[in-house]
Amino acid sequence: DSFYHEGVPVGAGRAVNAPAPAWRAHSGTVDWGDAATATSGAGFPAASALIAETLGEEEEKVVFIALGALTNLYDVLRENPASGDRIDRIVWYNSRAEPLSGANFETDSVAARYVLASGVPVTVVSANPACPVVVTPALIDSVAAVPNVYARKIAATHRTPPLAKLVGERHLEAWDDLVAVYLFAPELFSIRELNGTVRACELSDKSAAAEAQTRLTAILRGKPDSESRLFYGFPVGGALYAADVVPIIDSAVARHGLSEWRAGVLTNELHGHLGIYATIGVKMGIRAREYFNIGVDDILVTTYAGHKPPVSCMNDGLQVGTGASVGHGLITVAEIDTPRPEARFTFKDKTIRLVLKPRYADRIRRDVKRGIELYGDLTEPYWQYVRALALRYWLDFDRHEIFDMYVGD
């Protein structure tokens, strides 16, 4: 849960009672993250059932990425061979394709042979011993410079025992990671057709291996235009912003991420002034998308903020933060007697409800009341006061702390 993607479906695989790979004990000592201890599978649905459900729900064919044994997919295809029609291709990391060998194959060789013979297209990605992609301190430094939570976690883990020692000894290489490189830069790989539906690929030469290190960092950095339609990236240069906004830019982006900054800027331009509840709506919308780990335009929203300012101003932030706009028909304003800073978010039949915690709502009311006492209601000095409050809340309010979350509600 350390990345706040709690809504991403997780399933527990079937035990095959195979011997653990040689590195299992060592890997168990690595600090992978907050949820690393939840390895028993208790409370999770069966992986095969989750895969089958997901394949059935997707509108387009799926690229199925496998970084371990093929047991779960084998169970799905054996139960319902037609499920393979929903898969565009399988991209599987395995140590060797010719002949088949390595932990991912040997853990469940029956499953691997079945899937490879199923007729579903399979690309087997393997490391090339002649040109390994070594995880060096310089590569970890490059990863650490990428400004997102994933890169920071990777860098911190590899700078901490026991991985730090292995990095220093140049023992670690990119193995499973090569699947991501292949998906984003297939031109770096040489490909051999093994039969009509199965092919093997590995990095073609040392030049490709060197380029793979650069591509790994680029993959973590992501596309600058992943959320924008007109911008390539989003401007954060101080020269483009009002003088009172400039001091918070770097800190707000570092603390809350570029996605929240982008949505906050666009919302307040749309809203007509730098508003408190508009900014709360942004944070709420981004948090909901983060929970499901989805992009914009993918979520249904019901807001309980009503139609009357100031609370209804939250609706503008919700639209921009989620992409669930009135024009797309993805947001509904509930007709209620007492508006409140609360909204429901639904994605693929799963729903969460976010509510601004009372202590934050009370703080906003007290601060706004103080402004009215000092400057009068809706006067120009009052709006300047509200603007300063909104900037302070934008920077100080952490979207992971200010909302109560109710799942399936």
Predicted features, each with a name:
Residues 222-274, 280-409:
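Non-transmembrane, aqueous-exposed alpha-helical and coiled segments at domain scale
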Residues 206-210, 278, 308:
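Generic detection of long, well-ordered alpha-helical segments
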Residues 172-181, 273-283:
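Active-site nucleophilic cysteine motif
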Residues 1-233, 408:
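N-terminal acidic, glycine/proline-rich low-complexity segments
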